[in-house]
Swiss-Prot record:
PROSITE patterns: RIBOSOMAL_L22 (PS00464). One of its GO terms (cellular component) is large ribosomal subunit. CDD domains: Ribosomal_L22 (cd00336). It is found in: Plastid, Chloroplast. Its main location: plastid. This protein binds specifically to 23S rRNA. The globular domain of the protein is located near the polypeptide exit tunnel on the outside of the subunit, while an extended beta-hairpin is found that lines the wall of the exit tunnel in the center of the 70S ribosome. This is Large ribosomal subunit protein uL22c. Belongs to the universal ribosomal protein uL22 family. SUPFAM superfamilies: Ribosomal protein L22. PANTHER family: CHLOROPLAST 50S RIBOSOMAL PROTEIN L22-RELATED, LARGE RIBOSOMAL SUBUNIT PROTEIN UL22M. It comes from Chloranthus spicatus. InterPro entries: Ribosomal_uL22, Ribosomal_uL22_bac/chlpt-type, Ribosomal_uL22_bac/org-type, Ribosomal_uL22_CS, Ribosomal_uL22_sf. One of its GO terms (molecular function) is structural constituent of ribosome.
Length: 141
């Protein structure tokens, strides 16, 4: 599968993998925060009564720390541009039952992808990303 590109000048990604919760339960929380600002998202996640909100809270906090470290942007200027939950592998266990038998137990896991976008910065053009600058002769009047 082809990896999707993103604009690294104004966006920061954070991944969480193999979280022991079904993707359906996690999507219930992710759908509430998609497209909101960083501060508003943290407030919503603190007040939600779901168990799924804590791993998402930690991941968004980590993504904001990545943004401030790599891009030097303020956390207040961040916006959640993409929030995605995918199903992971199943953790398989055997539960002992009567007469020496065993029943399989499958626990679902999920993967979360959060992309934070900086509202204050504008995306660079292709030439600026490739060469680091844009000269008037490169544009070609």
């Amino acid at each position: 599968m082809k990896k999707k590109r993103f604009n690294s000048d104004i966006e920061v990604q954070a991944f969480a993998r193999h979280i022991c919760m079904s993707a359906h339960k996690m999507r219930r929380v992710i759908d509430q925060i998609r497209g909101r600002s960083y501060e508003q998202t943290l407030m919503i996640l603190e007040l939600m009564p779901y168990r799924a909100s804590y791993p998402i809270f930690r991941l968004i906090y980590s993504a904001a720390a990545n943004a401030s470290k790599t891009m030097g942007s303020k956390e207040a200027d961040s916006l959640i541009s993409k929030a995605e939950v995918n199903e992971g592998t199943f953790i398989k266990k055997l539960k002992p039952r009567a007469r020496g038998r065993s029943y399989p137990i499958k626990k679902p896991t999920c993967h979360i992808i959060i992309v934070l976008k900086d509202k204050s910065k504008k995306p660079k053009s292709f030439l600026e990303r490739k060469y680091g600058f844009v000269d008037k002769y490169m544009i070609g009047k």
